[in-house]
Amino acid sequence: MSALRLCPHHRPSEVQVAEEIARVAVIPYINIEHFPNNIPGTAIIPGTQQFNPDPLNYGWRDYGNRVGLWRMIELMDQIGMRGTVCLNSDIIREYPRIVEETNKRKWAFIGHGINNAPANFLSGIDEKKEREIVGGVLKAIEKAVGRKTKGWLSPFLTHTNNTPNILADLGVEYLCDYTADDHPFPLNVKKGSLVSVPYTVELNDIPAFANVGVSSEAFGDMIVDQFDVLYDEGADNARCMPICLHTFWVGQPNKFKHLKRAFGHIASHKDVWLTTGDDVNDWYRKNR
């Protein structure tokens, strides 16, 4: 049975999220990913993906880890915002300073597969192989950051019907693959418990830029507009607002300008909880 099937559906008035703290819980998810240079990956120019190597797209993606992320860290430091790092475990080996600096800032870390090569997507693999992949990623992150990995986001949000049960069995507390609600909700697992913490494909730079084709300014406007609606609704019933970002997209200067504007708008409001997936999970488990 799917983990999502038969999960309780709530009317908005029936759920509260940190209502004594804020009207909106803003969760910036920062996807920090590694793409092997000999395998096609997310591309700004798809026409060269078949080349090996593909310096055009590999270099564009690598800009995120070399430059874009640090621009984002500086901004988030300025406004007191912590990220929830969706981490490919290969980053630990390839870019150890990234893990050191974000961990120093007490950012949250959730598992996001080995790397973002299609060969490491979870869809279609057997349970034994999936358990090996998930378990290996969790152990690598826990060793690198020195604490339990509470959350998981499957690479490209690809998972199997076994994924939720494997995660719960391995001690993971929340999953971000389902984008179905403005609030956390429980998922059905065979043993233990697993919570769905909000994630989004709406306020997500990859589909916004690569699939929908919005402008940099429009993406900033989308963040502001989403916040304004949820902030108004949060006066009666607090909401979660995930913002899902990739360093090689919004870390580019022309896009970063509008991300900075949007984050400044959020930070200018009172009764806003700038938080992480870990903290939302902890709050929900304590108060549900």
Question: How would you name each of these model-derived features?
Answer:
Residues 2-151, 156-195, 220-243, 251-288:
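Catalytic alpha-helical scaffold of carbohydrate-active enzymes acting on polysaccharides/glycoconjugates
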Residues 206-210, 242-249:
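Short, local alpha-helical segments
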Residues 184, 196-218, 238:
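Positively charged, amphipathic and often flexible ligand-engagement surfaces
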